[in-house]
Amino acid sequence: PDATTLLKFRHLLEENDFGKEMFARIGALLQANGVKVSGGTIVDATLIAAPPSTKNEDKARDPEMHQVKKGNQWHFGMKIHVGTDSKTGLVHSASITAANVHDSHEVPNLLHGDETRFYGDSAYRGKAQRERLKEIAPNAKDFTNKRAYRNAPLSDADKEANRRKSSIRAKVEHPFLILKRLWGFAKVRYRGLAKNANRAFAMLAAINILRHGRPLTGEVRPA
């Protein structure tokens, strides 16, 4: 197909929210064919950069993208939030927001509700978050990383517990590695959240097929 046909097809996907639908249907199909979702969910988010410059046709930044401070650096763009199964690594839930939305805000969109274990970094820890977790997944135990405070440093036991939790949480980084480093989605391709969200959901669906799709495709045998 030529470039015009491809562009029309992309617009069709965007207008009908097909990227999100594709992600949901492929996830359901994989689960129906043996890729089980366990009781553990790991949540995390990654930043996708957008151009901060106003040197463009509109002489303005994308109004749907926002900036956030991470460490000592400011980042402008959006976030991809995911809920990943702690055993299989299947991305079963996702949401897309501007970069300034706090990671913990999206937890209700990232859990399936039957969790018995909830993993996340220290950004997902806190009293309000624990109360929210009880409402969404009442049987889930909180395995988020413990945070140190100014007058309350972590004990050696706390540090060791955090290391064990982090080794489990590493599964959530694999989809981000494919998405950003292998497939080049470290920066937004379009203006606006909706277009980039459609691309993100479609790519997450493709990642699930890449990593877990053998039950659907079977073995490829030579003729």
Language model features by range: what are they?
Residues 182, 186, 213-223:
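A short, flexible helix-boundary coil/loop motif
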Residues 112, 116-117, 122-198:
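Helix-centered, glycine/charged polyanion-binding patches within enzymatic domains
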Residues 1-139, 145, 201-207, 213, ...:
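Polybasic low-complexity intrinsically disordered regions
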